[in-house]
């Protein structure tokens, strides 16, 4: 039987680092990190995530400002708020809750976020630096994947890694981070032929396709490390892209959902805000 990778335990270690950083600054009467989060409309998922981000930030001593705009506003209203935050030296990180309502130009609005405060790595400049191997901030979900793999003290160099999914939020950036670690990376998607065989040859399998319980035991080998990034509602429960009960008996390591990648993502977002504060001081 495989071992479970506990994302909550890894997150606790990072949280301790953040707490120490914030407490040290408070003792020296220095500024503490402050994050601004913008919500447009009333999407239930975005409201939940913003609340979760605020809760974690407050528990670590990081200030968190919530800005809520009605769906009846327009692109320029959102951009005006972003520009204010860009100019505010007391704000170190800006989060734009996505997706925006359909009547907004998401790309146009994202472009307005200062790269120095883009702790979610959304802007073209941030993503360009990532693909050039010189990221200012690491995108949080892909960084969670890498952090969990490294927590196993396993050398990624030369490993055969299969990334299932090619989204701009997870698939592509996690593949780039793995390339930066000198892994041999294959990206698979809905048009990939012989998908089961490709996945089965992976030393590390990262699954991010948004299809609950898609990966079963026939997709993995007994030495595989399987990282499940998916989160879907399935039969009234939050479920990953991997059929946990079937795969845990076949692979070497597996992240659960919930309790895996998602447990670490918000913590790493807040860590990015700490790094932004430090950079702005120099």
From Swiss-Prot:
InterPro entries attached to this UniProt entry: Aminoacid_DH-like_N_sf, NAD(P)-bd_dom_sf, THF_DH/CycHdrlase, THF_DH/CycHdrlase_cat_dom, THF_DH/CycHdrlase_NAD-bd_dom
Keyword NADP recorded: yes
UniProt catalytic activity: (6R)-5,10-methylene-5,6,7,8-tetrahydrofolate + NADP(+) = (6R)-5,10-methenyltetrahydrofolate + NADPH; (6R)-5,10-methenyltetrahydrofolate + H2O = (6R)-10-formyltetrahydrofolate + H(+)
Binding-site residues, NADP(+): 165-167, 190, 231
EC number: 1.5.1.5, 3.5.4.9
UniProt keyword list: Amino-acid biosynthesis, Histidine biosynthesis, Hydrolase, Methionine biosynthesis, Multifunctional enzyme, NADP, One-carbon metabolism, Oxidoreductase, Purine biosynthesis
Superkingdom of the source species: Bacteria
Function: Catalyzes the oxidation of 5,10-methylenetetrahydrofolate to 5,10-methenyltetrahydrofolate and then the hydrolysis of 5,10-methenyltetrahydrofolate to 10-formyltetrahydrofolate.
Family, as annotated: Belongs to the tetrahydrofolate dehydrogenase/cyclohydrolase family.
Identification of the protein by name: Bifunctional protein FolD
Taxonomic lineage from the root: Bacteria, Bacillati, Bacillota, Clostridia, Eubacteriales
């Amino acid at each position: 039987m495989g071992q479970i990778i506990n994302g909550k335990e890894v997150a606790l270690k990072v949280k301790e680092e953040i707490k120490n950083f914030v407490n040290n600054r408070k003792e020296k009467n220095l500024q503490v990190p402050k994050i601004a989060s913008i919500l447009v409309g009333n999407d239930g998922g975005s409201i939940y995530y913003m609340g979760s981000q605020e809760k974690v930030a407050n528990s670590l001593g990081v200030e968190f400002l919530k800005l809520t705009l009605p769906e009846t506003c327009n692109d320029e209203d959102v951009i005006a708020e972003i520009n204010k935050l860009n100019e505010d030296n007391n704000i170190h990180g800006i989060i734009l809750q996505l997706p925006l309502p359909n009547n907004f130009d998401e790309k146009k609005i994202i472009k307005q976020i200062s790269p120095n405060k883009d702790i979610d790595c959304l802007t073209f400049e941030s993503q360009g630096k990532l693909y050039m191997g010189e990221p200012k901030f690491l995108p949080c979900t892909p960084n969670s994947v890498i952090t969990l793999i490294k927590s196993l003290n396993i050398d990624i160099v030369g490993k055969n890694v299969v990334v299932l999914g090619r989204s701009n939020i997870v698939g592509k950036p996690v593949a780039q981070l793995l390339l930066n670690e000198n892994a041999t990376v294959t990206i698979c998607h809905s048009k990939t032929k012989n998908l089961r065989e490709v996945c089965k040859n992976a030393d590390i399998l990262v699954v991010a396709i948004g299809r609950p319980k898609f990966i079963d035991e026939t997709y993995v080998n007994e030495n595989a490390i399987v990282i499940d990034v998916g989160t879907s509602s399935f039969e009234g429960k939050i479920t990953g892209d991997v059929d946990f009960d079937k795969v845990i008996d076949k692979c070497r390591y597996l992240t659960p959902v919930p309790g895996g990648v998602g447990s670490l993502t918000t913590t790493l977002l807040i860590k990015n805000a700490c790094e932004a504060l430090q950079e702005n001081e120099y």
